[in-house]
Amino acid sequence: MRAIVSIALLSVRLGAQTACPAGTTEVRPGNCEAPHDPPPSILDYRPKSTLVTPAHFVKVAKYPAIDFHGHPDELIMSEQGLETLHKALDGLNVRVMVAADNVSGGELRDAVAAIRASSAMRDRVRVLAGIDFNDVGPGWAERAVKQLDADVAAGAVGVGEISKSLGLSIRKRDGSRLKIDDPALDPIWDECARLGIPVFIHTADPWEFFQPVDYTNERWLELELFPGRRYPKDRFPSFEELMTERDNMFRKHPRTTFIAAHMGWHANDLASLGAMLDAMPNVYTEVGAVLYDIGRQPRASHDFFIKYQDRILFGKDSFQPSEYPYYFRVFETADEYFDYYRPYHAFWKLYGIALPDSVLKKVYFANALKITQGLPR
C-alpha cells in the first residue's frame, strides 16, 4: 500500500517553510508520498529523455581554436606523444594548445626542446612557466624573478596555470598561509608586466565545494566521489576570502594581464563575473571545465558572451578529445536539452548559446593572440 503522509503531521520545518520527510516527495500541496518500489540510488537513476528536438553534433570547431587551458602532460615530452597530440588536435580543429602544466627550469626546457624538434608540432604547442611558491620569505622574490626570466628566455609564453594551492594550502617560510595578495609576490606580477606576458591563474574551486556536503548541495555526488575536493571552514579559508584576495591582487597590478581560469568560478553567477571584468580591465577569463554552468543558462550566457566577447578565451582543461565537441555544440548551435559529458559534475542538461561568427572567432583564437605575443600567428 502506498504511503501517503500529511505534511502537517510529519513535515520537517526549515525556517518558515516545510519539507517532506526523508524517503517521500510532495505529490500534491500538503501531501507527501513514498515510491511503490524501493528507489534507486542517485548512481542508478538514469532517465532517458523522450524530447525530440533538432540535434547538431559538432565534431570540430568552426574556426581554428587555441586551447589556452591545455594539460597534455607527458604527450609533449616525446616524438610519439606529440604525434598522438597532433592527430587529436587536427581531428578537433584545435590549431594551438597552450600547455598550462606549471613547469619550470629543466622540465620546461626539455618540453620546449621536444616541441621544437617536431616538424609537425613546433607551431602547434606553446608552454607556460610555473612559479614555485614554496618557502616564500626573504630572498624568495629575487630567485623567483630570475627563474621566470630564464623560463621566458627558454620559450615560455606566459605564467600558469597557477594552482589553487596558492591561497588554499601553501605556507610561507614562517608557517603562515600564503595569501594570494601577499606583497611578497608583487615582484613576480610586476615582472610579468615588464615582460609583457599573461598570468593564467586558478583560484579556489566551485563555491559548492566550500559548503556543507548535504542533500541540498548541487555537487553532492562529486564531493562523495572525490572527498579531497571538500574545503571545510575549520581547515580552509572561505570561498569569499579567496576571491577577495585574488581581486586585490588583480587591482594592485593594473599593468599585468591576468586570465581567471574556469571563468573565475563565477559561471554560476555571471553578474559577479561581469562586475569583476568591468572593474578590472586587465583581467580576462577562460571557459575550461565550467561548460555545465554556461550551458544551463543559454540566454544569460549568450548575452554575457556578446557583452564580454573581447575578454573570454577558449580552454578545455583535462585533455580528453571526446569532450571537446560538447563545447563546440554549446557555443555554435541552438540545440536544446542535451547531455553533458560528466554526470557527476552536473545532473542537468545543456543548451546551445548560438554565438555569432564574429564572437566565435574572438573566443576561439583572437583574444588569446591579442594578449599572448608568443603564440603562433
State the predicted function of each range.
Residues 14-22:
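Boundary at the C-terminal end of the N-terminal hydrophobic targeting segment
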Residues 25-27:
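Extracellular, cysteine-rich, disulfide-stabilized repeat modules with beta-strand cores
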Residues 32-120:
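An N-terminally biased module of ancient metal coordination in phosphate/nucleic-acid-related enzymes
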Residues 42, 110-229:
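Active-site gating/metal-coordination segments in enzymes
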Residues 57-60, 85-91, 111-125, 146-156, ...:
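Acidic (Asp/Glu)-rich catalytic clusters
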Residues 64-70, 96-99, 125-130, 159-161, ...:
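Hydrophobic faces of well-ordered beta-strands that scaffold small-molecule active sites
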Residues 73-81, 100-110, 134-142, 169, ...:
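Acidic-and-aromatic substrate-binding clefts and catalytic sites of carbohydrate-active enzymes
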Residues 234-377:
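H/E-rich (His + Asp/Glu) clusters that bind or coordinate divalent metals
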